[in-house]
Amino acid sequence: MVLEAVLLGIVQGITEFLPISSTAHMYILAKLLNLHVPGRFFLSSVQLGTSFALILYFFKDVKGIISETSRSIYSFIQFGIRQKQGKRNEYTRLGLLLVTGTIPVVLLGFLLVRFVPDGFFSAARNLFTMGVALIVFGLLLGFADALFRRKKGNIFQITFIESVLIGAAQVFAIIPGVSRSGITITTARFLNFDRQLAVRFSFLLSLPVTFIGGMYGLVAGPDTDYYSLGYSLIGAIVSFVVGLLVVSALLRIISKTTFVLFVYYRVLFGLFLVIVSFF
């Protein structure tokens, strides 16, 4: 049990931030190693673990966004004052961009949950669908990364329309194999973000959705999760530590190279799943 929780926590910590789909890997690992498929409570716990890893790594950004956005909104409401461009206003703009990027995925997510039959989500969780999603969206990442050269390297170059598009793209991540970070990074690269800005914005944009989603999963009520509170806590701690290391490593890697290795991995892993699905 402890080993299973640790193993699943490691997989979540690695795959949550890499553009290779954490959901697909968690599901496949459980199936291949004959582990118990994690329930909502465990998945929410390890998701929160990686969320806290992001908060710690980007603590300066998160603190600046909260404090400066609040300060700017208060100043504007009270005095009609707008700040000039600068470090403080960078945090204010980033905060507003994250809000506009979060709104569409929340609305679209609500509509999907409300109107799409539960059978759709169950049907999507199969080897063939995951394999195809890994391949198709992996090729899209490779195409965007190779074709669209870096142009936008700072927050002030991002428009609110672009933040809405990137935020809305997250809805595709309901399909196992797509990858939330993968689709947002891909969209950002199509919009000519440089790699570091694409990854930074993608990670920060994920925080509201993953944190709120993780908290909701914990308080939504008991489920039939095989993993108890203790094992879920172990998984969360492991995913936090591993996630922190992966975020740091990824940001160093993409400053020196492209996403091509992730594209190759997605295509090969996707082909493997498609082939296995026929047996």
From Swiss-Prot:
One of its GO terms (molecular function) is undecaprenyl-diphosphatase activity. One of its GO terms (cellular component) is plasma membrane. It comes from the Bacteria. Keywords: Antibiotic resistance, Cell membrane, Cell shape, Cell wall biogenesis/degradation, Hydrolase, Membrane, Peptidoglycan synthesis, Transmembrane, Transmembrane helix. The keyword Cell wall biogenesis/degradation applies. Bacitracin is thought to be involved in the inhibition of peptidoglycan synthesis by sequestering undecaprenyl diphosphate, thereby reducing the pool of lipid carrier available. Belongs to the UppP family. This is Undecaprenyl-diphosphatase. The gene is uppP.
